Amino acid sequence: MLMRMSTLFLRTLREDPVEAEVASHKLLVRAGYVRRAAPGIYTWLPLGLKVLRKVEQVVREEMDAAGAQEVHFPALLPREPYEATNRWSDYGDGIFKLKDRKGADYLLAPTHEEMFTLLVKDLYSSYKDLPLSIYQIQTKYRDEARPRAGIIRGREFTMKDSYSFDVDDAGLERSYELHRQAYVRIFERLGLDFVIVSAVSGAMGGSRSEEFLHPTAIGEDTFVRSPGGYAANAEAVTTLAPPAVPFDGLPAAHVEDTPDTPTIETLVAVSNEKHPRADRPWTAADTLKNVFVVLRHPDGTREPLAVGVPGDREVDPKRLEAAVSPAEVEAFEAADFAKHPALVKGYIGPGVLGTEGASGIRYLVDPRVVDGTAWITGADAEGRHVFDLVAGRDFTPDGFVEAAEVKAGDPAPDGSGPLELARGIEIAHIFALGRRFAQALDLKVLDENGKQVVVTMGSYGVGVTRALACVAEGNHDEKGLVWPRALAPADVHVVATGKDPEIFATAERLAGELVAQGLEVLYDDRPKVSPGVKFKDAELIGVPTILVVGKGLAEGLVELKDRRSGDSEQVALDDAVSRVATAVRG
């Protein structure tokens, strides 16, 4: 195929878009691959669409090889199936909802579990029909509160979602593993570094889920790994709780004056100065910090919540949100404090917390707050703290919550060594859903004994546009994009420079011969554009092989450039087509 830049719908830019923060966003816009239509919404231009289709084709080939079959669902979906699974409300403000002219409710699909389930229910009724895996590559919609980083986190995006249907859990495990291995092959073919980590299931539910993360400093997700092979999204890390301590011999709780201690740091300093202990100094880890939030439940009700964590750690909003899902976390405002006069701001302790406490506010604590652990915490009086307040003896929380931040050096939950922290972008997520959706939508089949059984399901997603952005993020230099050969919009970029008609005629002939060889050719045949601009555009667009026809033609030579290495050489005109074909095909 031949694309002529003189007629190609393309406009390159020399300056970065003002809203762009990351390299992939800047370069995909500047090189004319995408164009912003609205916050989090992008138009795909011809070059971008070619790369996107190549990513889709890799995904399609590996899904087909894994035995999955492609279908295509509408993006506009009715409310009723999502009501049956509670996700109409569980998604909260995260989905786009609309009404038709008759007042019926619809949503723009964030994902399609319900619709796939109903389709299989409509067509299949026997164990003989299973196992089944079906997939689609389709546009999805999420009402992101803060779309950012171009197509990495948008409101409209392309996703491959697939679903497996099995009679039993053993079948689900096989389907899950088939998808897992297919994803490994997909990302290897795309040339993407990735790590597979344990993850939380969130609104999807299910017994098991894993994320495929692309490690990068710009990633929004924090994940951990250990020398022994443990890997998890920070939201999924479980805390190794210390053993409970016997109450016998523990000192009694005592309240002390601690004036002017608005922070953990000042509290520790005053405690060591005015209330020192004999064995060792007080540290932030000896304090119990109580943080207040409001949970907004899917039915719209608001519930105040107190979270107690050791003072040397902050509450991680993402871990808290994962722990309380599907509720959403909101700030505890001044008006909320006013409704609870028992709360003395800055000095709140467990004494007034809990559903049985004076405030009536549910109180969840970090798993490290086990029975027998002693703490410095608020005494519910201005300028006073209580020392040696013992969990299980002096206060009893309503439960535990995984909300404290995970730190480098924390022990891995499986004992495989200290954790190290890294950042990454989620490019895929796989879920062993189990029977949640099938149960809610009454998807059953007859088993071998003629008994109706609920089908067990898996759900598997690849962020196609996000994967493309990650490829761009990891394949660029100061001049522009440098596409892996398998994804480049063309195999070779032919550049005709100068004004000599013979140069353009030769470049035209070479481009035609390369197309005849089965190669995709991007041909810069623009007659009134300077060589400098053409070279800058070629480097910005990022086709891996560049063939320059210019002043060397007088000596029977053309220039062959490797975009990634920057190496170039003069080759004989008669050898140019074969040399390009060799460079492309290896």
UniProtKB/Swiss-Prot annotation:
CDD domains, per database record: ProRS_anticodon_short, ProRS_core_prok
Secretion signal, residue range per the UniProt entry: none
GO molecular function, one term: ATP binding
Keyword annotations from UniProtKB, A to Z: Aminoacyl-tRNA synthetase, ATP-binding, Cytoplasm, Ligase, Nucleotide-binding, Protein biosynthesis
Catalytic activity: tRNA(Pro) + L-proline + ATP = L-prolyl-tRNA(Pro) + AMP + diphosphate
EC number from the UniProt entry: 6.1.1.15
Any one GO CC term of the record: cytosol
SUPFAM superfamilies named among the record's database cross-references: Class II aaRS ABD-related (SSF52954), Class II aaRS and biotin synthetases (SSF55681), YbaK/ProRS associated domain (SSF55826)
Keyword Acetylation: no
Key word Transcription present: no
PANTHER family named among the record's database cross-references: MITOCHONDRIAL RIBOSOME PROTEIN L39/PROLYL-TRNA LIGASE FAMILY MEMBER, PROLINE--TRNA LIGASE
Role summary: Catalyzes the attachment of proline to tRNA(Pro) in a two-step reaction: proline is first activated by ATP to form Pro-AMP and then transferred to the acceptor end of tRNA(Pro). As ProRS can inadvertently accommodate and process non-cognate amino acids such as alanine and cysteine, to avoid such errors it has two additional distinct editing activities against alanine. One activity is designated as 'pretransfer' editing and involves the tRNA(Pro)-independent hydrolysis of activated Ala-AMP.
Family: Belongs to the class-II aminoacyl-tRNA synthetase family. ProS type 1 subfamily.
Domain notes: Consists of three domains: the N-terminal catalytic domain, the editing domain and the C-terminal anticodon-binding domain.
Name of the molecule in the record: Proline--tRNA ligase
Organism in which the protein naturally occurs: Kineococcus radiotolerans (strain ATCC BAA-149 / DSM 14245 / SRS30216)
Gene that this polypeptide is encoded by: proS
